[in-house]
């Protein structure tokens, strides 16, 4: 299209606006409103994303697409994801059914901002952060992640659990029935009355998986015998759909109601979503694991994983989202809990429900990490450089 033809086109469209003015005058329509609408249709550029976000900010909950097709609906649906708004394509049969069917009540997905932490005052006068994870488990939104060898030991796990945190006993070091039994006995002695821990089991290790959860079922048997275990974390791989559903039901049967899957890729997250869809009456906790820091079964960037799957995860009310991978400061943890991290990418806030702390916990008092390594962890600065799969920087 030449510059001349563009100019001619604009002139003709502007003339069309004038024609609308004439029609409005003849038919008694609001001339100002009619002209404004015509200008937006013919000659004025429209930032549709900004317009929709402005509607959301003004408190609008529904958009009615008057047609003639559902084009505007298809353009708008991605924009309103996470904003707590709905759109109805009134020119389609489905849209008309939702509008005119007696008793029909179209629903709106909750705004993602509704998942942000809220302050809650406890009976002792203290104020804590309330998230979907804290309401589900009764624990802090800061979790001690399972990692071999640090949380193979009972003391650090018990210390975290006694302080009100989710605390994972790493199955990577519980390599025989005798060692497992001894560790559970030690934990039972160290834990305060009413406290419990969670067991982290490596799905990728056939021997350990069969010993602990899948075959000999040491974890389930221990729970049935009164062991203080109320959660199982499936890490380093995701079972197939049928096996996962059977596992969830079995764990619920023995009193383990916190079932966690720890995906490290988009495909694995989608697998967990399918699992959650199959068990709508069971809570499924997802530990989305990025590849930063150490000890993770992921080579992916955490933000990329969340941006690709957050909307799908939030479609399921039985899914609770925790994240980890290089979150080493309170400030960074707060960005994920509040969801503000997503603003850097031009998205609405995407709050998560809990934060996994792993590598940073290696420097704690209770960790059996050597003093020299603890000091090195404290002194070593992080890097903003992303190291992809199969690559290395500085050795």
Predicted regions and their residues:
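Conserved small-residue
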Residues: 1, 55, 63-67, 160, ...
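Active-site glycine- and acidic-residue-rich loops that bind
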Residues: 1, 260-271, 327-338
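Acyltransferase/transacylase module recognition
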Residues: 1-109
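Extended charged low-complexity segments that act as oligomerization/scaffolding linkers
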Residues: 30, 98-104, 111-113, 138, ...
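Non-catalytic positions within long, well-ordered alpha-helices that form the structural scaffold/packing
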Residues: 56-59, 64, 161, 225, ...
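Active-site entrance/lid segments in N-terminal catalytic domains of soluble metabolic enzymes
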Residues: 105-317
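Glycine-rich adenosine-cofactor-binding loop
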Residues: 148, 318-337, 358
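Conserved active-site-proximal phosphate/metal-binding subdomains
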Residues: 313, 317, 337-395
């Amino acid at each position: 299209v030449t510059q001349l033809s563009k100019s001619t086109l604009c002139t003709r469209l502007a003339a069309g606006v004038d024609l609308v003015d004439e029609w409005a005058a003849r038919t008694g329509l609001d001339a100002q409103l009619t002209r404004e609408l015509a200008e937006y249709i013919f000659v004025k550029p429209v930032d549709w994303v900004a317009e929709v976000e402005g509607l959301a900010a003004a408190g609008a909950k529904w958009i009615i697409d008057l047609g003639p097709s559902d084009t505007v609906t298809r353009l708008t649906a991605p924009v309103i994801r996470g904003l707590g708004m709905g759109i109805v394509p009134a020119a389609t049969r489905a849209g008309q059914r939702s509008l005119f069917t007696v008793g029909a009540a179209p629903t709106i997905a909750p705004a993602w901002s509704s998942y942000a932490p809220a302050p809650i005052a406890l009976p002792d006068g203290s104020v804590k952060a309330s998230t979907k994870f804290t309401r589900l488990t009764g624990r802090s939104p800061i979790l001690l992640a399972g990692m071999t060898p640090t949380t193979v030991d009972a003391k650090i796990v018990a210390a975290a659990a006694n302080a009100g945190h989710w605390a994972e006993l790493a199955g990577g070091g519980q390599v025989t029935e005798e060692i497992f039994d001894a560790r559970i006995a030690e934990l039972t002695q160290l834990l305060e009355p009413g406290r419990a821990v969670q067991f982290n089991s490596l799905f990728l290790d056939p021997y350990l998986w069969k010993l602990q959860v899948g075959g000999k079922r040491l974890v389930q048997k221990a729970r049935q015998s009164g062991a203080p275990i109320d959660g199982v974390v499936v890490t380093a791989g995701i079972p197939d759909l049928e096996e996962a559903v059977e596992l969830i039901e079995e764990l619920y049967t023995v009193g383990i109601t916190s079932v966690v899957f720890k995906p490290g890729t988009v495909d694995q997250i989608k697998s967990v979503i399918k699992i959650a869809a199959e068990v709508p009456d069971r809570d499924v906790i997802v530990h989305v694991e990025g590849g930063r820091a150490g000890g993770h079964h992921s080579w992916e960037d955490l933000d990329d994983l969340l941006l690709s799957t957050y909307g799908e995860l939030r479609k399921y009310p039985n899914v609770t989202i925790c994240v980890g991978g290089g979150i080493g400061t309170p400030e960074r943890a707060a960005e994920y809990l509040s969801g503000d991290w997503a603003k850097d990418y031009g998205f609405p806030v995407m709050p998560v429900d809990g934060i996994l702390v792993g590598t940073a916990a290696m420097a704690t008092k209770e960790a059996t990490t050597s003093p020299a390594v603890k000091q090195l962890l404290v002194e070593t600065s992080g890097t903003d450089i992303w190291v992809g799969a199969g690559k290395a920087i500085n050795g």
